[in-house]
Amino acid sequence: MGASMEKQTVVTRFAPSPTGFLHIGGARTALFNWLFARHHGGKFLLRIEDTDRARSTQEAIDAILDGMRWLDLGWDGEVVYQFARAERHAEVARELLANGHAYRCYATPEELAELREQQRAAKQPLRYDGRWRDRDPSEAPAGAPFVIRLKAPRTGEVTIDDQVQGPVTVQNAELDDMILLRSDGTPTYMLAVVVDDHDMGVTHVIRGDDHLNNAFRQLALIRAMGWEEPVYAHIPLIHGADGAKLSKRHGALGVDAYRDELGLLSEAVNNYLLRLGWGHGDDEIISREQAVEWFDLAGVGRSPSRFDFKKLENLNGHYMREADDARLADLIAPGVAARAGREFDSADHDLLLRSIPFLKVRAKDINELAEGASFLFRTRPLDMDEKAASLLDDPGKALLAQAREALAATDDWSALALEAGVRSVAERGGIGLGKVAQPLRAALTGRTTSPGIFDVLALLGREESLGRLDDQLG
């Protein structure tokens, strides 16, 4: 049984716990929920499940919101904080108690520990045996602490027609009477989730398949309250390249690390996560507009997807080449300025912006782009890396001197005119253009890789270029 998309507005939610960063699996869950809601013209809600007060931190909440904004996964309405709704959760538990769908359980921790030991010894499943299910509360000692448990069905079965996993059936006898309110009056996670989803009008619960077992217990609670059941879609988890569940040993986990440490663009991460478990034919490069138009739950596979950093890196390279030059310049300016050890002025920004078209064609990420641009702002005389220094031996310097002479005689300081001057040196010596370009690149950048050497000359300008050559010629 599920909500009908035709009759009501689709409402999805992303409900992370703020006990750490927004991890990559959570980001994909958020993306799928966001796309499904947008595809159906519905609402996408954000709920912070901060009921674990010992582990929930404001820093983690900020990291989650920051990650969501970076991925451009805007939510509708205000953020819902679960802990603030504790009284509403308790109210529902009391309502269930009043209508006979819940009961007070006075079993002590010692009794429950003994029960578990007996079940272990008998090799039985560890579950509460319902000892207070039909007992009169007056049998308990006066003032004894109690929890409130759901009186779950004990016979029959429950089937979830999962939109990803297909129909999944569990015998009710396998489900125990879960705790709704603890002895201190605080609601459990299972109660809070169900109440919040109902009150927020959530029609589709799209989440990791590690929550599938929870769904059967949650459904028992929904039915006890007589509430409309959501449509469930439990998506497979993300695995590392070795097939094990994605963990720290596989590399970056937090969305912030993909941005700050790996230097990836948000659109590349979104595109990669979309294709990680969902497909649309052979399409690999999928725009945000196409994703909204095409996304459906039928395209989500049942098998775990393997995270491939190389594929993500290549995808990011594509988006780097497509990205707006001014945006890229703004993204790398702080890093390039830090490398240069100074504040950038408008002239520096202008030079950086002019360099982007030449640099972005070979950069796979923001870090590579920043490193590629740093030669423009290095202090003279340049530090040479080992390979560059080896190109400036005596034969290399002899070619450099000839190139310097040809460049100094060039009136039009444009890439085309500069190439003609350097090419004439190569032709006179009966050597390839690369033989002259190699020591020239080393002297101008201190490295052996850079944009095209004539683009480098044009970007640096006459005075800076000739000055750098003179530094190496002594």
Swiss-Prot record:
Localization of this protein: Cytoplasm
Pfam family, one: Anticodon_2
Binding positions (ATP): K248
GO cellular component: cytosol
InterPro entries attached to this UniProt entry: aa-tRNA-synth_I_cd-bd (IPR045462), aa-tRNA-synth_I_codon-bd_sub2 (IPR020751), aa-tRNA-synth_I_CS (IPR001412), aa_tRNA-synth_I_cd-bd_sf (IPR008925), Glu-tRNA-ligase_bac/mito (IPR004527), Glu/Gln-tRNA-synth (IPR000924), Glu/Gln-tRNA-synth_Ib_cat-dom (IPR020058), GluQ/Sye (IPR049940)
EC number(s) on file: 6.1.1.17
Position of sequence motif 'HIGH' region: 16-26
GO MF annotation, one: glutamate-tRNA ligase activity
Function per UniProt: Catalyzes the attachment of glutamate to tRNA(Glu) in a two-step reaction: glutamate is first activated by ATP to form Glu-AMP and then transferred to the acceptor end of tRNA(Glu).
Homology family: Belongs to the class-I aminoacyl-tRNA synthetase family. Glutamate--tRNA ligase type 1 subfamily.
Entry protein name: Glutamate--tRNA ligase 2
